[in-house]
């Protein structure tokens, strides 16, 4: 397995992309790049600066002054905003419910995609998001599109919130996830959609281990070529 490939994992909100991508990256000793965390960090920075997130010009000013870095912690990946650890605060419902608005702006996405492509230049990466296979890494050797029902995804996010000590309402989460799906798939710039050459993986009734196993067997097939 000397070959260093790029693996793109796309899918809607709370489909389990990040969880699976982290495990796959660890199994392969690859770098994991969480593009969702990059948009979350930008959203957090904009909210902290009380910027109008519907205003692209104001957001671009934030983007220009934001340095986002990843570091491997003991059991998880840490996210830093201008040197400050923001790994936890970017996961609050406040940020979660606004990240799709920030991500819809053309200039914002163009700059973020440029940064993401920069991080992936040398290969040996697992990257997850909404438009990785279609836009960020169109030449990735492995492309996965993960799906799960709104109900299943809301349940997962609900448990995640409770485990982190956040208030959580399951019915409200179902509505919010459906709304994020709508925003992500209908936006003009790089909408959420399956790449033509991506393999679709419905994770509704699968465990994390089963999903990882399926992806690893796809990767093994690529290495065998």
From Swiss-Prot:
HAMAP family: Cytidyl_kinase_type1. Keywords: ATP-binding, Cytoplasm, Kinase, Nucleotide-binding, Transferase. Gene3D superfamilies: P-loop containing nucleotide triphosphate hydrolases. GO terms for biological process: nucleobase-containing small molecule interconversion; pyrimidine nucleotide metabolic process. GO terms for cellular component: cytosol. Pfam families: Cytidylate_kin. It comes from the Bacteria. InterPro entries: Cytidylate_kin (IPR003136), Cytidylate_kinase_dom (IPR011994), P-loop_NTPase (IPR027417). It is found in: Cytoplasm. It comes from Bacillus cereus (strain G9842). One of its GO terms (molecular function) is ATP binding. Its EC number is 2.7.4.25. This is Cytidylate kinase.
């Amino acid at each position: 397995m000397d070959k260093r490939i790029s693996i793109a994992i796309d899918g809607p909100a709370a489909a389990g992309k990040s969880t699976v991508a982290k495990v796959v990256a660890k199994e392969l000793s690859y770098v994991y790049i969480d593009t969702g965390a990059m948009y979350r960090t930008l959203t957090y920075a904009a909210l902290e600066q009380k910027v109008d997130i519907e205003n692209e010009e104001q957001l671009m000013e934030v983007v220009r002054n934001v340095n986002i870095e990843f570091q491997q912690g003991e059991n998880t990946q840490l996210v830093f905003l201008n040197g400050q650890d923001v790994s936890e605060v970017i996961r609050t419902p406040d940020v979660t419910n606004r990240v799709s608005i920030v991500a819809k702006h053309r200039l914002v996405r163009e700059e973020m995609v440029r940064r993401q492509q920069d991080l992936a230049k040398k290969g040996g990466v697992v990257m997850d998001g909404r438009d990785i296979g279609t836009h960020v890494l169109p030449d990735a050797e492995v492309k996965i599109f993960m799906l799960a029902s709104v109900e299943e995804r809301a349940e997962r996010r609900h448990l995640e919130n409770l485990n982190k000590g956040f208030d959580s309402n399951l019915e409200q989460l179902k509505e919010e996830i459906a709304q994020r799906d709508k925003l992500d798939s209908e936006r003009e710039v790089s909408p959420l959609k399956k790449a033509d050459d991506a393999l679709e993986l419905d994770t509704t009734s699968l465990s994390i281990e089963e999903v990882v196993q399926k992806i690893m067997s796809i990767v093994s097939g690529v290495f065998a070529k």
